[in-house]
Curated annotation (Swiss-Prot):
GO cellular component: cytoplasm
Purpose: Condenses 4-methyl-5-(beta-hydroxyethyl)thiazole monophosphate (THZ-P) and 2-methyl-4-amino-5-hydroxymethyl pyrimidine pyrophosphate (HMP-PP) to form thiamine monophosphate (TMP).
E.C. numbers: 2.5.1.3
Species this protein is from: Prochlorococcus marinus (strain AS9601)
Highest taxon in the source lineage: Bacteria
Cofactor(s) needed by this chain: Mg(2+)
HAMAP family: TMP_synthase (MF_00097), TMP_synthase_cyanobact (MF_01327)
Protein name: Thiamine-phosphate synthase
Length: 351
């Protein structure tokens, strides 16, 4: 409750400070709430943020509102250049989270003088917003990666090449948006350095960088995702360690593999081999009809893999296959940029 231990003029100044910062905090919360609702579809966070906003609204007393017009504010309308430089949803989330946190800190400090209840409320919400900010940023990053995954039909897997970085850049220039890196020979230090270099290339071209199998390398290189085989670390543990802003894909060869992958919450599935392939010599080809049966009810992205070449993509397309993963076709190409462009064109062609 309010008390009258301070002088009237000082009270007015303090009320004005609290009023301005309650407005700032509530406005910033509204921005976060709307992004959680319309941008991310996260009902849990919408309810949580709305509750914070309503609590502050309930404590926005009339005495605070009345103070705003009683002392002239010569700094009204001041802006900063950084406010004009926000170009992404992440920047908007970060700036408005900071706006809320800073406003709540001011409220917490000044309301201690006469309204301990409001000070406590501001402190509790401020600490909650630190976590909300991190979660919203993670969800937003995942949303972008998920969008790339859904909208792009060519998934390129690397092979060991002396000029690997050159090949990767050529296919990225061509328009490839998903790269999975497989490790073969070399030390872990070599693998990490190579992963970081490929990650930087993918970032430059707004493409996803996915690491095959190695969670440690994926974490250390800040990869966008990881692809797991049936004998790798389980998805639940991987998700816990890797985080919810990252893409996790699973290899599948049968209905049980697919069912388990869906139950565990994977983001995409690689299904195959479709045809005979030198990269999976011990795997019997599934064939077109078998894969069509396996995938008829799949509602997440899936990529056909195994023995896929530029000369059989049109055949796959005619059979309803939309997304494919390639290895040797581009890794062994004499002109990876041109071949990647041709394959992308073929995949975009409506049969």
């Amino acid at each position: 409750m309010l008390n009258s231990n301070t002088k009237d003029h000082e009270d007015l100044r303090i009320y004005q400070i609290i009023d301005a910062n309650l407005d700032r905090a509530r406005e910033g919360l509204r921005v976060l709430e709307d992004w959680a609702r319309f941008g991310l579809g996260k009902e849990k966070y919408v309810e949580k943020i709305k509750n914070f906003r309503q609590i502050l609204g309930k404590n926005h007393l009339e005495v605070y509102k009345q103070s705003r017009n009683q002392i002239e504010d010569n700094c009204k309308g001041l802006t900063h250049q950084e406010q004009l430089n926000r170009k992404t949803s992440e920047q908007i989330i970060s700036s408005n989270s900071a706006r809320v946190q800073e406003a709540l800190r001011v409220i917490e400090e000044f309301s201690r003088l006469h309204n301990n209840e409001l000070s406590k409320i501001a402190s509790e919400i401020r600490y909650e917003i630190y976590t909300v900010e991190i979660d919203l940023l993670s969800f937003s990053k995942f949303k972008k990666s998920e969008k790339i995954l859904k909208e792009n039909d060519l998934y390129v897997i690397t092979d060991q090449k002396d000029n690997l970085l050159e090949i990767i850049e050529e296919i990225l220039i061509a328009g490839v948006k998903i790269i999975q890196h497989r490790f073969k020979t070399g030390t872990d230090q070599d693998h990490l350095q190579e992963a970081i270099e490929i990650k930087n290339l993918c970032k430059r071209y707004n493409s996803l960088f996915i690491v095959n199998d190695r969670l440690d390398i994926a974490l250390a290189s800040n990869a966008d995702g990881i692809h797991l085989g049936q004998d790798d670390l389980d998805l639940k543990t991987t998700r816990k360690l890797f985080g919810y802003s990252k893409i996790i894909g699973i290899s599948a060869n049968n209905a049980i593999d697919i069912s388990n992958a869906l139950d565990e919450g994977c983001d995409y599935i690689g299904i195959g081999p479709v045809f005979e392939t030198t990269t999976k010599k011990n795997k019997k080809p599934l064939g077109i009809e078998n894969i069509k049966t396996l995938t008829k009810d799949l509602n997440i992205p899936w990529f056909a893999i195994g023995g896929i070449k530029s000369n059989n993509i049109s055949y796959l397309k005619r059979n309803g296959f939309k997304k494919v993963a390639l290895v040797s076709e581009l890794m062994n190409s004499e002109d990876p940029k041109e071949d990647a462009m041709m394959i992308l064109k073929e995949l975009s062609h409506e049969n």
